[in-house]
């Protein structure tokens, strides 16, 4: 693990695998952050649902939001599986021996965080909808509106900067080229050549 980044490098993290024993498992701080945001949304949802009306169309709209949330969570599992098959482990911050730039990573350097941001927006839209059709709770409404912004700022200003530093240290030339051609959150940059 490097002091500057706090992330284990692929070779050091995989040494225990070569010695025959598994590497000690730990959850990445970003997993804990994602879980915290999800739990906050569940609390807001339960609070809003408990005090709101339950007309059939309200339930149908809430079910649609629920379906979108299931797609978001399933998408994150698929992205983590994609990264895992290429030698990295997003759950424990094991950096792959080769920089992953294919699949969704060709369009976003952080597709899991992007999908989690979409998930936050869907959760917030559900809470706002329930607030509009039920009794208004200003604190719940304010939290629903602020949580996606808090997630974005925390990841953009803190988490992703640390991860970029770790990836740059592990793959200096490849990451420099990759970050010039693919946006931090989304999109290929203009004039960028394929990796």
Predicted regions and their residues:
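Histidine-centered phosphotransfer motif of kinases
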Residues: 110-111
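Membrane-anchoring alpha-helices and their flanking helix-loop junctions
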Residues: 1-105, 114-195
